[in-house]
Structure formats: structure tokens, C-alpha cells
């Protein structure tokens, strides 16, 4: 039994939190891009 396996153990909650933060950031970015596009379309109609 070496030290290898114990080093690779990560806290599952940390992994989940990391994924959640990434997902939220990605969603915010997409929303912002859609908002910018909508604003451009709106301004071109005036």
C-alpha cells in the first residue's frame, strides 16, 4: 500500500462546487451574449 491512491482522493463536495460555479459562469456568459445581441437588434430597428 503506497501513497499513490490517497493523493488522488478529492473531496466530492469540492468537485461538485467547482462544477456548479463553472456552470453558473457559463450560463451568465451566454445570457450576457444573448442580451447584447438583442440590444443590437433592437437598436437597428429604431
From Swiss-Prot:
Residue numbers of Isoleucine amide PTMs: 46
Transmembrane regions listed in the UniProt entry: none
Any one annotated GO CC term: extracellular region
Pfam family, one: CRF
Subcellular location: Secreted
SMART domains to which the protein is assigned, alphabetical: CRF
Keywords: Amidation, Hormone, Secreted
Gene Ontology molecular functions: hormone activity
Task performed by this protein: Regulation of fluid secretion. Stimulates primary urine secretion by Malpighian tubules and causes a dose-dependent stimulation of cAMP levels in the tubules.
UniProt record similarity statement: Belongs to the sauvagine/corticotropin-releasing factor/urotensin I family.
Protein name: Diuretic hormone
Organism per entry: Locusta migratoria (Migratory locust)
